[in-house]
Swiss-Prot record:
GO terms for cellular component: extracellular space. This is Kunitz-type serine protease inhibitor blackelin-2. The lineage of its organism: Eukaryota, Metazoa, Chordata, Craniata, Vertebrata. The keyword Cell membrane does not apply. It comes from the Eukaryota. Expressed by the venom gland. Its main location: secreted. InterPro entries: Kunitz_BPTI (IPR002223), Kunitz_BPTI_sf (IPR036880), Prtase_inh_Kunz-CS (IPR020901), TFPI/VKTCI-like (IPR050098). Keywords: Disulfide bond, Protease inhibitor, Secreted, Serine protease inhibitor, Signal. Coiled coil: none annotated. Belongs to the venom Kunitz-type family. GO terms for molecular function: serine-type endopeptidase inhibitor activity. Serine protease inhibitor.
Amino acid sequence: MSSGGLLLLLGLLTLWEGLTPVSSKDRPDFCELPDDRGPCRGIFHAFYYNPDQRQCLEFIYGGCYGNANNFKTIDECKRTCAA
């Protein structure tokens, strides 16, 4: 293969890498945890990452305990688990 062809291939692979979503091995382990309301009875809109749907979803957080897959904003969830 010519050097021009190799450069083109390298460029395409680099572009592909930038377009592919983060694999599960690159995201924190807590992103795999289920949504967890916790035992308290508050009503707080929060977001968690759903690994089956590969997106951040809203849920109601009770205000205490729960787990680390719990974000105040969808943007924070996406930056941490889906980006």
